[in-house]
Amino acid sequence: MVNKPNPKAYRPEDYPYERGLAFLLRDNYRYFSRHLKIHLERHGSSLPQWYFLRVLAGQDGLSQKELSDRVGVLAPGTVTALNKLQSKGWVERQPHPSDKRKSNVYLTKKGRRLVRSLLPEAIKSNNIALEILTEEQMEQLRELLILLRAGMKKKSIDGDFP
């Protein structure tokens, strides 16, 4: 069981930044993304754009709102990203069948080809971790991260989390 710190007794020397969970997650994200970023840039894409392409590759035809939620980007950021993706010919928007005010987003053939060509590099980035952790440890880590995300999301929605 992890001891919860006493907020009245916080001292920086007792809580080194490099042991902080958010710091560790961010630092690992940087290492994972650095490898993929090089390959994305060669194809004229970026990490933020890749997230949208990757989500759509898993489930095409999502609304902009659904995409925002899944990628974790606010609506204005989603609109900007989709405009760029559309200008590159990687996605297209089609009117929602029952609500003409909304649109659904689809990968184009060109977008699908891009995802297929970049997916091996994304998998390589993930597999680097398998050189460090066993498959069992990787699965445990995934499960813990999923649990953490769900808990953090719930706290955020409930207003208990800034």
Where are the model-predicted features located?
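Charged, amphipathic alpha-helical coiled-coil/dimerization segments
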Residues: N3-K4, K8, S33, N83-I146, ...
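Short alpha-helical "packing" element that flanks the helix-turn-helix/winged-helix DNA-binding module
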Residues: F52-L53
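Short capping segments at the starts of secondary-structure elements
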Residues: Q59-S63
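Alpha-helical transmembrane segments and membrane-interface helix-loop junctions
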Residues: Q64, N104, L144-P162
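Helix-turn-helix DNA-binding motif, specifically the short coil turn and the N-cap/start of the second
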Residues: L74-G77
